[in-house]
Amino acid sequence: MSTIMQKIKEIEDEMAKTQKNKATSHHLGLLKAKLAKLRRDLLAPPTKGGGGGAGEGFDVTKSGDSRVGLVGFPSVGKSTLLNKLTGTFSEVASYEFTTLTCIPGVITYRGAKIQLLDLPGIIEGAKDGKGRGRQVISTARTCNCILIVLDAIKPITHKRLIEKELEGFGIRLNKEPPNLTFRKKDKGGINLTSTVAVTHLDLDTVKAICGEYRMHNADITLRYDATADDLIDVIEGSRIYMPCIYAVNKIDSITLEELEILDKLPHYCPVSAHLEWNLDGLLDKIWEYLDLTRIYTKPKAMNPDYDDPVILSSKKRTVEDFCIRIHKDMLKQFKYALVWGSSAKHKPQRVGKEHELEDEDVVQIVKKI
């Protein structure tokens, strides 16, 4: 592992010394590809027969409808924030793991059970194998949203460091997957086409990056001005794209003018965990970023159950998804569904499995006789 870390440092040093311009883009693209491969090797799970790797003992059972991971440096008030949120809205449970205390709490908010998970151990250099970063980030990758807790006194410094660590683990915050296609083929070399003007990538750079992965035949289509990093992300194929909120804590220690600036920044939510300022606003933002859909069930000849909604992701909210969420065998008996709500053209509307539901729709499943 020390050899891999040494190679990573050498490449990072070379990249830092290399000026970014058109003449060096080919070389930098090649270095970035080498770096991505080394980090992948570094963060790979230990092979069997190693006498018990550092990854043993860290696992948190996923519960609830969605999971939010709290990340932050020590003494930024992360634990206080977690305790205030869970203490106000639900009970908090704690579980001890090997050399690491992880405190998951579940809150019920707008009918959804949301697991808040404290992820300790995010330190500078964690992406390079220091501490227990690999184990912590493997859990972070299972989250539906990341909540980075920052100190209002030095928010930008901590923000950049944490983002760098998460980026190194293949987690992309508040980004969409690269809008490009990469199709491997048996022969014909590397072909690059684009539907827009391209300023970051040329054919030589693309060939160099593909060559590092021993790919010499592929068709690549760019639908936006993609970078070398974007191409590498697609080739690596193990990137996680998730929403992120920056909870700036201890706002009682800054001026009103500074607070107004923070409040205007995208994805930021100023709070004071100690004084319980704007915790409702933070929960609203978490709900917005999780983008969940609540569906109420209605048994035949009975009123809808508004107390215990079925929670779906906004990306998977068809009637079929709804049935699977309730029970995997429900589809075998499915005949049609009756839907009341904003997705229905009339009330009720008879629909099939492919119908897309909207938040707070009411659904009655009609089974085969």
Curated annotation (Swiss-Prot):
* TGS domain residues: 291-367
Which keywords has UniProt assigned to this entry? GTP-binding, Nucleotide-binding
Q: Which Pfam families match?
A: MMR_HSR1, MMR_HSR1_Xtn, TGS
Q: Where is the OBG-type G domain?
A: 66-291
Binding annotation for GTP: 72-79, 118-122, 249-252
Family recorded in the similarity comment: Belongs to the TRAFAC class OBG-HflX-like GTPase superfamily. OBG GTPase family.
Which NCBIfam families does the record associate with it?
small_GTP
| UniProt protein name | Developmentally-regulated G-protein 3
- According to its UniProt entry, this protein's organism is Arabidopsis thaliana (Mouse-ear cress)
